[in-house]
Amino acid sequence: MDYYFTKGKPQLVNMKTPIYLVTQFQQLMDLMQNQYEVSCLELMQRSGKAACDFLVYRWPKVKKISIFCGRGDNGGQGYVLAQQAKKMGMIPTVWQVGHQMSMSKPPQMHKEVWYEMNSCHQQGIVLHTYSPDIDLGDPELIVDALFGVGLYGHVRPEIALLLQRLQQFTVPILAIEVPTGINASTGEIAGNALAATATITFLCMKLGLLINDGKIYSGEIAFDDLLAPEEIYQQVKGIEESSLLDSSTCFSKKIWYRNKTQKGWQLSIN
């Protein structure tokens, strides 16, 4: 059953979203950029702001947040979230994993990520280079913006140690796109993974969040369509194999939705 929350009171609605593999998600991203002319930077900003909106909606009393950013696009989403969080009165601290602040774009970093990293710096947001022996303080919430769907192969040993360290905190963990260490298509663990309290994913629902270990590690799921036109989901079809979602791998789960026709979040108990 699907519910729309108005002043805390649930009302029944009908809301569904297509489910995709990572390769299909990448096709959707290509269409958004090339056919619908939404830039990579704009998509990054929409997703980072949506993540912050959900954070505030789900945990309205949180003030001190720690955002762990990788050097890829997922990290860029984390940088956008940090800026939005500061505008909304929170105290964001960014932990840079595998990179550090630079006045010139590092060779392996996309220009959009570098732009958002520098925007954080210009706005006075504290940027720390992560190291295993550094004190992480006492955040009220942790944001996982390390890899998203961009993880290939197994989690490196140094990242596995970081995930173990973060898992020891007793505060909520919000993962952006996919919890680090979870394969977004298969739901399998890539050696080690971070169990999130909630995961916000964009443009389409990733199959790996709904099956196998991914269904456990993703926690509650929030979905935002990034203002994508409805036609895009006809151009790239979602999965059709019902066996991928059989009863042996799936169980009841909270899923929050928001699309371009809604201002609030809808809760579905699947």
Swiss-Prot record:
Its cofactor is K(+). The keyword Translocase does not apply. K(+) binds at residues 74, 144, 180. GO terms for molecular function: metal ion binding; NAD(P)HX epimerase activity; nucleotide binding. Binds 1 potassium ion per subunit. Residues 25-234 form the YjeF N-terminal domain. It holds the Pfam family YjeF_N. Gene3D superfamilies: YjeF N-terminal domain. The keyword Acyltransferase does not apply. Its EC number is 5.1.99.6. Keywords: Isomerase, Metal-binding, NAD, NADP, Nucleotide-binding, Potassium. InterPro entries: YjeF_N_dom, YjeF_N_dom_sf. It catalyses: (6R)-NADHX = (6S)-NADHX; (6R)-NADPHX = (6S)-NADPHX. (6S)-NADPHX binds at residues 73-77, 148-154, 177. Catalyzes the epimerization of the S- and R-forms of NAD(P)HX, a damaged form of NAD(P)H that is a result of enzymatic or heat-dependent hydration. This is a prerequisite for the S-specific NAD(P)H-hydrate dehydratase to allow the repair of both epimers of NAD(P)HX. Belongs to the NnrE/AIBP family. This is NAD(P)H-hydrate epimerase. It comes from Legionella pneumophila (strain Paris). The gene is nnrE.
